[in-house]
Each structure stands twice: as C-alpha cells, then as structure tokens.
Amino acid sequence: MPAQDNSRFVIRDRNWHPKALTPDYKTSIARSPRQALVSIPQSISETTGPNFSHLGFGAHDHDLLLNFNNGGLPIGERIIVAGRVVDQYGKPVPNTLVEMWQANAGGRYRHKNDRYLAPLDPNFGGVGRCLTDSDGYYSFRTIKPGPYPWRNGPNDWRPAHIHFGISGPSIATKLITQLYFEGDPLIPMCPIVKSIANPEAVQQLIAKLDMNNANPMDCLAYRFDIVLRGQRKTHFENC
C-alpha cells in the first residue's frame, strides 16, 4: 500500500494490542467477544468522518483550572498535558477534536455513580476539549489526578490517569485511550495495563515529564503524543 494513500488503513499488529479477554481484569470476562471477529471492508463510511472545526469553543474549554471555576481554583498539583496527534504514517492530524476527562486530585470523578469517599472539588469539573492546531498539537492545563480503588480485586487501585477521546479525520480513526504518568509505582500493578503484553505499547501510554513546556512558578508539564491507527497506534482503551 503506497504511503501517500491516506484513505485506507494499514493492518493493525495484533501482537501490539491486548487480548480482549484477560481474566485478571474482571470486566473483560463479560465484555470480550466469544465468536471470531468479522473483518468489514473499508468504505466511505469508515474513511470519512465529521469535521469539528465549526464548533464554538469556550475560552477555557482546554483549561480545567478555570472551566469549572466557582469562585476559587481547584486543589492539587497543577500540570500541563500536551502533545501531538499523528496518523499511521507519522503525519500530523490538524483540526481534530481532542476530549479529555479525569478524576480530581483525590481520585474522584464528578459523576453520580462515583461513590469513592474522597470529596468532590467544587472548582473542578474534570472535563476539557480542544482542536489540534495546523501541526497536530494540543494542550490542556489541569490538575494531576489521584489514584483510586476499584472493584476488580480485594485491593486493586487504578494508577493516576487521564482519559482521552480523539476523533481523527474519519470514523475508523476514532480513539479512546488513557494517559499514565512517568514514575507511578501503580502502573505495573494495574490489571488493565498488564493486559498489554508489549512493553513498548505500555510505554506509549506513559506521559513523560517535559520541563521545556513547563510554566515557571505555575505548572509542570507532561508530553503525551498520540498515534491514530496503523501498526504502532496508541492502545485503544480496554475498559
């Protein structure tokens, strides 16, 4: 397949992606398919998608320190999360919608079904969105999320993480994934992370400290690049 043909997608590497059924990750038992997957031919339905450049974005949609402000600033470690979205050939993906959602510094989501005992932060909503620029770059300012317990095992904890949704240029490039933070000791203990057999694929999910992008006296920064589709695409969230 010629590299310049961006209307079709290269075959994904099944060894790069986790198996759908990983019993240590309890939820996968009910969610994994029991029958062989069916390959669907690529058509215009898969190779095209919505254009989000016309959306009206608020001034603070990408700034989670300010977009749920109720008279104060949220509690926690202030950080910048930024990176570049590229396609299966390493080319930047401009003007694509990037959405993110996360727990607060105490490890609690602003969601009615989250019953973790950590308190909600009255000044933190935990959601943001932006469009990539002409070179595929995005940036958010937020609070570093806290870890939290989950009902997988007797004492399983999720590492600090941020969920990302990237639309890409077509329906087939839509990606839901998770960012983890460099140096977190909970990463190798997490059953979701351990479902990914390839250590390089795991490393692709770990944001690295980026002092060049930090704001002095304000925020540390972490770099998280995202690959849509292809042999080395960013891992699709298995939860």
From Swiss-Prot:
It is an enzyme of class 1 (oxidoreductase). It comes from the Bacteria. Its EC number is 1.13.11.3. Keywords: Aromatic hydrocarbons catabolism, Dioxygenase, Iron, Metal-binding, Oxidoreductase. GO terms for biological process: 3,4-dihydroxybenzoate catabolic process; beta-ketoadipate pathway. Pfam families: Dioxygenase_C, PCDO_beta_N. Its cofactor is Fe(3+). GO terms for molecular function: ferric iron binding; protocatechuate 3,4-dioxygenase activity. It catalyses: 3,4-dihydroxybenzoate + O2 = 3-carboxy-cis,cis-muconate + 2 H(+). NCBIfam families: protocat_beta. Plays an essential role in the utilization of numerous aromatic and hydroaromatic compounds via the beta-ketoadipate pathway. Belongs to the intradiol ring-cleavage dioxygenase family. The enzyme is an oligomer of 12 copies of the alpha and beta chains. This is Protocatechuate 3,4-dioxygenase beta chain. It comes from Pseudomonas putida.
